[in-house]
């Protein structure tokens, strides 16, 4: 059960609340760097998320001091505007200004009504309302309903990415994330790309076919190998794909693809497409062509 879905009766009403978060302003961003970040555990003890987030934060969270807390403790602390919080939630897309909507807005394809599993980085707020909490660069992990095996291995890389985002916010409260990705794009040709074969469209699922479109260094790997590369801060890049996975494909489903650096979480490339029979939930041939323009 996600952090704000405490009572079943409120699930429908609260499902989209975090999608309405707004970006932190300059003062709130500055306060973040003075804050302690509270890592909020999930109430569901059967999820592997809790041991994973504790392990990965311990390895990769460098930007602020942190403390792991329960949801009960979060309810007490969330009204403190001097504290920051990292927690899991579900959220629908909205027209409000937050980091994911900024990225999604670069691409056409219609309105996205899907719900996403989000790793939130926010400041506390006196009202205690989650949709009032200033967003510091929350990042989607997966579409809601995706099994943990589709996102837990990427949490370390996403934590690194979040820290890169908030450092950019410190320089400029309204950074041009697309420009940042484009500036980093040239690094793709100098770093080995690691991809999981099943996350590629069927026509790319052989090394021969992939190499025809991608002449640079690459490797087909497992989820465990990507997690280990992030833990070791290896000089490779990897695909962070967000899509329906094994869920039933709807007309509104989108596939979002990030290329991230395992070493430091830098965003090197991002693309998004509406899922269809011709464009499956996977990295496409056209994605490789676009990356290498």
Region locations from a protein language model:
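Hydrophobic beta-strand residues in large extracellular and virion-surface proteins
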Residues: 86, 119-121, 193
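Flexible, glycine-rich surface segments
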Residues: 167-254
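Amphipathic beta-strand/beta-sheet edge segments enriched in Tyr/Trp
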Residues: 90-156, 227-293
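Structural alpha-beta junctions
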Residues: 58-69, 209-221, 263-265
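A general structural signal for short secondary-structure junctions and capping/turn motifs
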Residues: 2, 75-78, 228-229
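Bacterial Sec-dependent N-terminal signal peptides
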Residues: 1-25
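Start-of-domain marker
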Residues: 20-117
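Sec-dependent signal peptide cleavage junction
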Residues: 18-55, 61-64, 156-196, 200-201, ...
């Amino acid at each position: 059960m996600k952090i704000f879905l405490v009572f079943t009766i409120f699930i429908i009403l609260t499902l989209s609340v975090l999608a309405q978060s707004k970006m932190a302003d300059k003062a709130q961003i500055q306060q973040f760097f003075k804050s302690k970040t509270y890592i909020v555990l999930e109430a569901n003890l059967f999820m592997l998320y809790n041991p994973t987030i504790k392990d990965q934060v311990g390895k990769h969270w460098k930007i602020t001091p942190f403390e792991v807390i329960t949801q009960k403790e979060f309810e007490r602390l969330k009204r403190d505007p001097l504290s920051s919080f990292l927690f899991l939630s579900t959220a629908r897309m909205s027209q409000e200004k937050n980091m994911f909507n900024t990225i999604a807005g670069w691409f056409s394809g219609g309105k996205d009504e899907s719900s996403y599993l989000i790793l939130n980085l926010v400041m506390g707020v006196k009202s205690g309302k989650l949709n009032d909490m200033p967003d510091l660069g929350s990042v989607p992990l997966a579409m809601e309903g995706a099994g943990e095996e589709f996102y837990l291995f990427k949490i370390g890389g996403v934590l690194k990415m979040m820290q890169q985002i908030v450092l950019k916010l410190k320089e400029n409260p309204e950074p041009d994330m697309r420009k940042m990705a484009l500036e980093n794009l040239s690094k793709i040709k100098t770093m080995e790309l690691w991809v999981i074969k099943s996350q590629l469209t069927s026509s790319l699922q052989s090394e021969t076919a992939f190499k025809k479109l991608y002449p640079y260094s690459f490797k087909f790997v497992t989820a465990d190998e990507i997690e280990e590369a992030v833990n070791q801060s290896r000089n490779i890049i990897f695909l962070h794909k967000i899509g329906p996975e094994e869920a039933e494909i709807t007309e509104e489903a989108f596939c979002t693809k990030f290329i991230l650096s395992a070493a430091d979480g830098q965003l090197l490339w991002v693309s998004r497409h509406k899922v269809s029979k011709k464009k499956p939930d996977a990295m496409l041939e056209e994605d490789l062509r676009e990356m290498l323009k």
